[in-house]
C-alpha cells in the first residue's frame, strides 16, 4: 500500500464513519463490481489504526461531553451526568450481545450479498427521509429511547444499513432533539470502537513492516482530519433537517445495487 492509497482509504473511513451512507455496504458493492480479488482486504493493523483515528476525532469534538460521562460514572449520584452515562451503557448492550453471540451469523451476511445490501440501503434511505420530515423533536434521550436506539445500532451491523443513519433517525423519530440525537449517536459508538480495537489486539495478528510506517501514519492523519470535518458537518446537517440529501443518495445506490444483483 502506498501513501496515496492510504490517504484515500483514510479519508473514506473518516467520512463514512459519520455520514449516513453505510461504509460496509459500499465495500460490499465495490467487491462485487470489481471482483473480490480486485479489492483486497485492508490489513488488520491498518483497519485498527483507521478506527482509532475516527474514534479519536470523536473524542476531540465531544471532549466535554465525554469528560462528563466519566465524571458521572464515578460520582454514583443520581444526577444528569450519571443518568447520561447509564444511557450510553444501555445503548451499547444490544450491539455487544449481537456481536458476541451471533458473530458467525453476521459474517454470513457479508461477501457478495448485493441484493441484501441494496435493500438495506433503501431501508436506510427511508429512515433518513422519515427523520428529515419528523416534527416535535425537542425531547431528551430517555432510558427507553437509549434502549431502542441501541437496538437500531445492532440492526445496523447488517451491510447496507448506516449506523449513524439508523441511530440518528431512530432518535429523531422518537422525538429526541436533533442535535442531541446526533451527539448521542456519535458518543454511543466510541466505547464499541475501542472494544473492537481491544478485541483485535488481544486476538493477535497486528503487525507491520518498517516500510508501512509512512502509509499507516498518512492514513491515520487523513482519517482523523476527515472525521473531524464529517462529524461537525453531520451535526449541522441533522440540525438543519438536511438528511434527505443522503436519503436520495442511498436510494440511488440501493436501486443500482438491486438492479446489478438481479441482472447478474
Language model feature labels by segment:
Residues 1-264:
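Multi-pass membrane proteins that catalyze or facilitate reactions on polyprenyl-/lipid-phosphate substrates
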Amino acid at each position: 500500500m502506498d501513501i496515496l492509497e492510504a490517504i484515500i482509504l483514510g479519508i473514506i473511513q473518516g467520512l463514512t464513519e459519520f455520514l449516513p451512507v453505510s461504509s460496509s455496504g459500499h465495500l460490499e458493492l465495490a467487491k462485487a463490481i470489481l471482483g473480490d480479488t480486485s479489492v483486497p482486504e485492508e490489513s488488520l493493523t491498518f483497519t485498527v489504526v483507521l478506527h482509532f483515528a475516527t474514534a479519536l476525532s470523536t473524542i476531540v469534538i465531544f471532549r466535554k461531553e465525554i469528560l462528563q460521562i466519566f465524571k458521572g460514572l464515578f460520582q454514583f449520584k443520581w444526577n444528569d451526568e450519571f443518568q447520561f452515562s447509564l444511557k450510553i451503557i444501555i445503548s451499547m448492550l444490544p450491539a455487544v450481545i449481537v456481536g458476541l453471540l451471533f458473530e458467525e451469523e453476521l459474517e454470513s451476511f457479508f461477501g457478495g450479498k448485493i441484493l441484501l445490501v441494496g435493500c438495506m440501503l433503501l431501508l436506510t434511505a427511508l429512515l433518513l427521509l422519515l427523520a428529515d420530515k419528523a416534527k416535535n423533536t425537542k425531547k431528551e434521550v430517555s432510558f427507553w429511547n437509549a434502549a431502542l436506539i441501541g437496538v437500531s445500532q445492532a440492526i445496523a451491523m447488517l451491510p447496507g444499513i448506516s449506523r449513524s443513519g439508523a441511530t440518528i433517525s431512530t432518535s429523531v423519530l422518537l422525538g429526541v432533539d436533533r442535535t442531541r440525537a446526533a451527539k448521542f449517536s456519535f458518543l454511543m459508538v466510541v466505547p464499541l470502537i475501542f472494544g473492537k480495537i481491544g478485541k483485535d489486539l488481544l486476538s493477535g495478528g497486528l503487525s507491520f513492516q518498517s516500510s508501512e510506517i509512512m502509509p499507516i501514519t498518512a492514513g491515520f492523519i487523513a482519517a482523523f482530519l476527515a472525521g473531524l470535518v464529517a462529524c461537525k458537518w453531520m451535526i449541522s446537517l441533522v440540525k438543519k433537517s438536511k438528511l434527505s440529501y443522503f436519503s436520495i443518495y442511498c436510494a440511488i445506490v440501493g436501486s443500482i445495487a438491486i438492479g446489478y444483483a438481479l441482472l447478474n
